[in-house]
């Protein structure tokens, strides 16, 4: 989706990805397969480009640091990525910058967590999060019993009290090198209860204007604290008391902004390019209400992918599917998304629910 926008700007693109079958390999000008966590792979790739950006934050940060010191322009900056890569350092950053976030405990390994529980420092229920390498719902678990603790993986983690909340919200902020900044409307996210993956993204969020204003102000504060350049997705909770707490951020184009391709004056992918190229930022207003439905692999299906009933959703006005080009499906793997647009958010929501029931991502 980002490469679609680079083509409009006639930008020569070189991509590094771990998979030889990455869909981007068919679209970019030059493709390199390699381990994103390997220093030499990332460093050698970076020596061949004029400007480097990321699509996933799990990348060898030491290589990026070296490249930046040698003069390569990298956005977002390695300094920002290093903080964001680790949920513990990310939470510490929010605390230092007086950015509202849920109270937390940091543990270097699982035995520390168990010791803390036995000494009544942490209590059930709580949310366990792996400090690193969480992605699309992985690395997050709700812990209600000691048996749940026993089933947690080893390694560095954070623990947060399970806070009742009204809504999960997100704001995408765009900021260029000159410090020009703008934000997209607040969106509302609905998650799958088991996979902890986004099922629906709803724009605009169905919240009071004062809550939306507060969320956008906090998102802008986060971007400013990072001195961020690029696109920053700020995920937040609206608590029962209408507090806004920052959950985490993604330093890249994000699932919560996919609706913008059809619904916004400037989609998030073009906006990311404008930001990192230090161009004027585009209009972030929505033209219509937009809802995104995630397309993920159905449970019980692993193998060559089939998009069952895709022709049926194409009969519905305002519905646009985006298929990512991945050949193999497996349970809960993100395979695409569908955008629904309408002037009426209520109508769009009904169509989104209809689409969710109709289309299925299965295997042959």
Where do the language-model regions lie?
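Short, well-ordered beta-strand elements within core beta-sheets of diverse protein domains
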Residues: 161, 261, 338-341
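ATP-binding N-terminal substructure of ATP-dependent carboxylate-amine bond-forming enzymes
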Residues: 1-85, 89-92
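Peripheral (often C-terminal) accessory segments that flank ATP-dependent C-N-forming ligase machineries
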Residues: 274-364
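Anion (oxyanion) recognition and catalysis
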Residues: 7, 68, 95, 122, ...
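Phosphate-binding core of ATP-grasp and ATP-grasp-like enzymes
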Residues: 153-207, 212-246, 250-258, 273-283, ...
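Structural motif corresponding to alpha-helix initiation and N-cap regions
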Residues: 35-39, 61, 110-113, 146, ...
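Active-site nucleotide/adenylate-binding loops and adjacent lid/helix of ATP-dependent enzymes
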Residues: 81-170, 174-222, 356
């Amino acid at each position: 989706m980002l490469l679609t926008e680079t083509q409009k700007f006639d930008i020569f693109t070189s991509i590094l990805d771990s998979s030889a079958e990455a869909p981007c390999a068919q679209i970019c000008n030059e493709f390199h397969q390699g381990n994103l966590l390997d220093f030499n792979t990332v460093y050698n790739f970076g020596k061949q480009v004029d400007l480097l950006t990321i699509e996933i934050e799990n990348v060898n940060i030491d290589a990026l640091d070296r490249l930046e010191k040698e003069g390569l322009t990298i956005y977002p900056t390695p300094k920002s990525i290093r903080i964001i890569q680790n949920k513990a350092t990310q939470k510490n950053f929010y605390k230092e910058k007086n950015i509202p976030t849920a109270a937390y405990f940091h543990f270097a390994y699982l035995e520390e967590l168990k010791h803390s529980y036995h000494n009544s420092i942490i209590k059930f229920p709580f949310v366990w999060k792996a400090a690193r390498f969480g992605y699309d719902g992985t690395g997050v678990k709700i812990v209600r019993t000691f048996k749940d603790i026993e089933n947690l993986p080893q390694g560095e983690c954070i623990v947060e009290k399970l806070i009742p909340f009204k809504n999960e919200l997100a704001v995408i902020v765009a900021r260029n090198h000159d410090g020009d900044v703008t934000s997209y409307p607040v969106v509302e996210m609905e998650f799958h209860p088991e996979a902890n993956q986004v099922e629906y993204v709803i724009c605009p969020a169905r919240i009071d204007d004062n809550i939306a204003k507060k969320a956008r102000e906090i998102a802008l504060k986060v971007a400013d604290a990072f001195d961020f350049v690029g696109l920053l997705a700020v995920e937040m909770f609206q608590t029962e008391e209408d507090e806004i707490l920052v959950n985490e951020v993604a330093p890249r184009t994000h699932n919560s902004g996919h609706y913008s391709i059809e619904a916004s004056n400037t989609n998030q992918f073009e906006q990311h390019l404008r930001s990192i190229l230090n161009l004027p930022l585009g209009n972030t207003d929505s033209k219509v209400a937009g809802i995104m439905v995630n397309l993920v692999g159905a449970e019980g299906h692993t193998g060559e992918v089939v998009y069952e009933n895709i022709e049926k959703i194409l009969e519905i006005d305002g519905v646009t599917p985006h298929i990512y080009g991945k050949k193999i499906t497996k349970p809960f793997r993100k395979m695409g998304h569908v955008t629904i647009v309408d002037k009426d958010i209520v109508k769009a929501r009904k169509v989104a629910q209809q689409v969710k029931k109709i289309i299925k991502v299965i295997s042959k």
